[in-house]
UniProtKB/Swiss-Prot annotation:
GO terms for biological process: cytoplasmic translational initiation; negative regulation of cellular response to amino acid starvation; regulation of translational initiation. The modification Phosphoserine is found at residues 296, 300. Keywords: Cytoplasm, Initiation factor, Phosphoprotein, Protein biosynthesis, Translation regulation. The keyword Cytoplasm applies. Present with 9530 molecules/cell in log phase SD medium. The gene is GCD1. It comes from Saccharomyces cerevisiae (strain ATCC 204508 / S288c) (Baker's yeast). InterPro entries: eIF2B_gamma (IPR051960), GlmU/GlgC-like_hexapep (IPR056818), Nucleotide-diphossugar_trans (IPR029044), Trimer_LpxA-like_sf (IPR011004). This is Translation initiation factor eIF2B subunit gamma. It is found in: Cytoplasm, Cytosol.
Length: 578
């Protein structure tokens, strides 16, 4: 089964002040006016199309695209692309906003070059062995710019023409130890009438770094309604999703009586998190198409004069063509075709209108509601909950971002021949990742931390459980505990920071103590810069004014804070309570 993979790169609304939706990349040169993001980006991309473009961009900008935020000194999207290479997908495409796609492509240049060299080494090693028939070239990675305002709109208007078979939608921010074959096999074994399979997981990490972040995560919980179908041979299916805010507003969880009538043994969970991984069948494209194609499909589905229902024949894949000729004695299937689903049958889709001008999480919520809202059942959406023994992290908020880095550090500390390192009387723990270009002065201590390139650590510093972006400068006797320091930031001597987030290019004056604060730059209308201490809710854009706008639709794939309070769209069959 050949599957196309689409990796969505969002803005990262919950990763501020290191990245934030609709935040213009500003330069830090006070002698001139701030350059626009497009001009500066084009200048850097055209001047250096390699990995150094990121470091050079950090010297002028305070924030980065989310896909290029480092996890273990590697852009987070590289872990997703490595995972896709293990799955052997038919095609890999990276979808990002049009103002970030060039920088993301440039930031992955060194990764793509190394990836090609690795495949060449494997080719040389296996060319003379009995496994030469397994040799293949690395899948090309396409970069697709998106001008859509939401991920659902991007899928409907920009990606549907590129899809020619089953496909999977992935985020750019997950780190996991689950082999992709586990999810692919689960998708292959889905029920005949399932249009897609969503992946959910339980948060197994007990992070206690930032209490404010934990409180925000509790407010952003969701009530996930699903059925395990224990009394039948069917696979579990997703039924509905409700937001914590909506339930709090109405003071009770409202579940439709029609849903309870069809699924009396449903389960409601607040511990499940959406992974933003959707394995979709090609039949789903028939529901999501719009415009003249949708009108023609609706016309062919029902005769306006006679009212007779007519058979809808959606485009078929190669495997479907082989199954269609099972009764043909003269038909000879291809010798190389693999047909793991011999008894699959096509679904007679009822082409209900689907509104895709929203995030994909809402689109699949509407598709799950579609399966039971109508008097005639529709095709359901499957759900697969990852086992507790596995580890899955989505770095879509600051707490999870730190957990992802600690997961990589834990793997590094457990590898063989790993030991503590002494550099000029400075102690570097086995659970730390330090770039070779870092400068660490005497009597400093680094434990369970990640230090980016060209970081400068003063003498007698103590860095524990922290993440330092490239170009960070620490004075003497600085203490950092569970902090994230943005690129080119400067921390004065004898400062003590605990559970703090420092934006890039920010300067902390000497002898300051902060705990649980977010320090960010503020750009005034006159292009003047000032420095203030912001509360996390202000930085993350969770003010009441921001909630009333639709500016965060594009970043819904980055977080699970999108609202699920849209009105129901259903066929009035008289079974709903009023």
């Amino acid at each position: 089964m050949s599957i196309q993979a689409f990796v969505f790169c969002g803005k990262g609304s919950n990763l501020a002040p290191f990245t934030q939706p609709d935040f213009p990349f500003q330069t830090q040169n006070k002698d001139s006016t701030a350059a626009t993001s497009g001009d500066k980006l084009n200048e850097l991309v055209n001047s250096a199309l390699d990995s150094t473009v990121i470091n050079e961009f950090m010297q002028h900008s305070t924030r980065l695209p989310k896909a290029l935020l480092p996890i273990g000194n590697r852009p987070m999207i590289e872990y997703v692309l490595d995972w896709c290479d293990q799955a052997d997908f038919k095609e890999i495409s990276v979808v990002a906003p049009v103002d970030e796609i060039e920088l993301i492509e440039s930031g992955l240049t060194s990764f793509l070059s190394l990836r090609k060299q690795q495949f060449e080494l494997i080719y040389k090693a296996l060319s003379n062995s009995n496994h030469s028939h397994h040799l293949q070239d690395p899948k090309k990675i396409n970069f697709i710019p998106s001008k859509a305002n939401s991920t659902g709109e991007s899928l409907q208007k920009e990606l549907l023409p590129r899809i020619n078979g089953d496909f999977v939608i992935l985020p750019c921010d997950f780190v996991t130890d689950i082999p992709p074959q586990v999810l692919v096999d689960q998708f292959r074994n889905r029920d005949d009438n399932n249009l897609a399979m969503t992946i959910y997981y339980k948060n197994s990490l007990d992070s206690s770094i930032d209490k404010k972040q934990q409180q925000k995560q509790k407010q952003q919980q969701f009530f996930t309604v699903y059925s395990e179908n224990e009394d039948s041979e069917r696979q579990p299916i997703l039924l509905d999703v409700y937001s914590q805010r909506d339930v709090t507003k109405t003071k009770y969880l409202q579940i439709r009586s029609h849903l309870l009538w069809n699924y009396p043994n449903l389960t409601v969970s607040t511990k499940l998190l959406n992974s933003f991984i959707y394995f979709c069948s090609f039949e789903l494209c028939q529901l999501l198409k719009l415009g003249p194609q949708s009108m023609s499909r609706q016309a062919s589905f029902k005769d306006p004069f006679t009212g007779n229902q007519q058979q809808q024949n959606p485009p078929t894949t190669d495997d479907d063509e082989d199954r269609n000729h099972d009764d043909d004695d003269d038909y000879k299937p291809s010798a190389t075709s693999i047909q793991p689903t011999y008894f699959k049958k096509k679904n007679d889709l009822i082409l209900d209108p689907i509104n895709c001008n929203k995030s994909l999480s809402k689109v699949f919520r509407d598709l799950s509601r579609r399966s039971w809202q109508h008097s005639k059942p529709r095709e359901p959406i499957g759900i697969f909950i990852l086992p507790n023994e596995t580890l899955f992290i989505r770095a879509n908020n600051l707490n999870a971002y730190m957990d992802a880095n600690r997961f990589v550090l834990k793997i590094k500390s457990q590898t063989m021949f790993t030991k503590n390192i002494q550099i000029q009387s400075a102690a570097i723990g086995a659970d730390a990742i330090v770039d070779p270009k870092c400068q660490i002065s005497a009597h400093s201590n680094v434990k369970m931390s990640v230090l980016g390139t060209q970081a400068n650590i003063g003498s007698r510093c103590r860095v524990a459980g922290s993440l330092l972006f490239p170009g960070v400068h620490l004075g003497d006797e600085v203490i950092l505990e569970n902090c994230i320091i943005g690129p080119m930031a400067k921390i004065g001597s004898k400062c003590k920071l605990s559970n703090c987030y420092i934006e890039g290019h920010y300067v902390v004056e000497p002898k300051n103590n902060f705990k649980g604060e977010t320090l960010a730059n503020v750009y005034l209308d006159e292009d003047e810069e000032d420095e203030l201490i912001y509360d996390d809710s202000v930085i993350a854009g969770e003010s009441e004014i921001a909630e009333e706008t639709d500016s965060d639709d594009r970043s819904d794939e980055d977080s699970d804070d999108s609202e699920y309070t849209d009105e129901y769209e259903y066929e009035d069959d008289g079974l709903f309570e009023r």
